[in-house]
């Protein structure tokens, strides 16, 4: 934590092709070793696959997938009286999008399709249909929060 007050958040620029800040954030999460051009070409190829398979606008499918992946609740560990409790807390909006993007990309990387653009496209389409590993992760996080609802009065 900084000693000299809060640091101002840097705002990402909207994507030049789809004019969406969420798409830019997804490109930044896809990027490895600063290779942004490679990450954006992977994403645009994935969006092309989504367009071909669904016939819908790929950004709309992606936003629907993000709504199905972003968590509302999560648990945080807190030590009280010598034992650790998992306390359910609401997720801030910025953290919701970050977690959703992180889960989408990480579970897309674990898939078995041949190229990364196929993996990403299929993971986004699965998430839009409320299936897939990223949605399962969200359900697991919500299940943990629900199971520990008894400790909700230990606020952070």
Swiss-Prot record:
Cross-referenced InterPro entries: Ribosomal_uS7, Ribosomal_uS7_bac/org-type, Ribosomal_uS7_CS, Ribosomal_uS7_dom, Ribosomal_uS7_dom_sf
Superkingdom of origin: Bacteria
Entry's Gene Ontology cellular component terms: small ribosomal subunit
Alphabetical keyword list: Ribonucleoprotein, Ribosomal protein, RNA-binding, rRNA-binding, tRNA-binding
Record's keyword annotation contains Phosphoprotein: no
GO biological process: translation
Ribosomal protein is among the record's keywords: yes
GO MF entry, a single one: structural constituent of ribosome
Self-association state and partner proteins as the record states: Part of the 30S ribosomal subunit. Contacts proteins S9 and S11.
Similarity annotation: Belongs to the universal ribosomal protein uS7 family.
Annotated function: One of the primary rRNA binding proteins, it binds directly to 16S rRNA where it nucleates assembly of the head domain of the 30S subunit. Is located at the subunit interface close to the decoding center, probably blocks exit of the E-site tRNA.
Name of the protein in its database record: Small ribosomal subunit protein uS7
Recorded name of the encoding gene: rpsG
